[in-house]
């Protein structure tokens, strides 16, 4: 269900009314206004002696032109037929978005295993609450979710999610698709609560309890 040019909700994970209503309570708009207020307080602290704190919004504003250039340069070829050079170029907006969202800060410990990065707060040795997936750029969300298409940026070997070092599981078969990777992550008892897939102009959010039902949220960056 496309609720706007920028948002697509899979299998009614979030109601259309919640996302589109102008109500300022118990709505998507209310959450946006609340978060904007929090970010403004950090970007422009009341104390004149306090230094501004960067936020995802301030980082996006400063990098917006660069991000637009990178997205405009993405290859228009089918995701499964991209050259190595095209895949490398496609990784640039992915890396920039991670920086904008704050995942490269010292607040987080990143465990990268191929196209899957497990994210946990520094000092937390439990299962990672978030996984970031690098995917090939796609034109539509439907292309991203084809079960057996080579949509990941590279093959992924499933890992032991209970171990903070995430060693590769012996005997596991390599995974090529975003859909299969998400299912592997979300059905593991030690899997992340959320996953964020970055695929060129699209960012897809999946949640552990709802992904098996085919529910997700996609944003056209």
Language-model segments: residues:
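Nucleic acid-processing catalytic cores of prokaryotic defense/repair systems
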Residues: 1-221
């Amino acid at each position: 269900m496309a609720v706007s040019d920028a948002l697509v909700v899979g299998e009614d994970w979030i109601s259309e009314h919640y996302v589109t209503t102008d109500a300022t309570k118990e709505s998507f708009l209310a959450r946006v206004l609340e978060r904007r207020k929090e970010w403004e307080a950090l970007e422009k602290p009341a104390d004149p002696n306090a230094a501004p704190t960067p936020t995802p919004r301030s980082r996006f504003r400063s990098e917006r032109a660069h991000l637009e250039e990178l997205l405009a340069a993405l290859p228009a070829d089918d995701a499964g037929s991209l050259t190595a050079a095209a895949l490398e170029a496609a990784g640039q907006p992915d890396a920039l978005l991670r920086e904008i969202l704050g995942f490269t800060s010292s607040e987080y410990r990143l465990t990268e295993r191929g196209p899957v990065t497990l994210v946990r707060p520094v000092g937390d040795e439990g299962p990672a609450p978030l996984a970031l997936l690098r995917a090939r750029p796609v034109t539509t969300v439907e292309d991203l979710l084809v079960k057996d298409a080579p949509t990941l940026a590279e093959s992924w070997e499933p890992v032991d999610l209970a171990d903070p070092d995430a060693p590769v599981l012996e005997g596991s078969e390599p995974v090529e698709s975003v859909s299969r990777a998400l299912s592997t992550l979300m059905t593991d008892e030690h899997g992340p609560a959320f996953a964020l897939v970055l695929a060129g102009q699209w960012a897809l959010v999946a949640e552990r309890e709802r992904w098996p039902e085919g529910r997700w949220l996609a944003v056209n960056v």
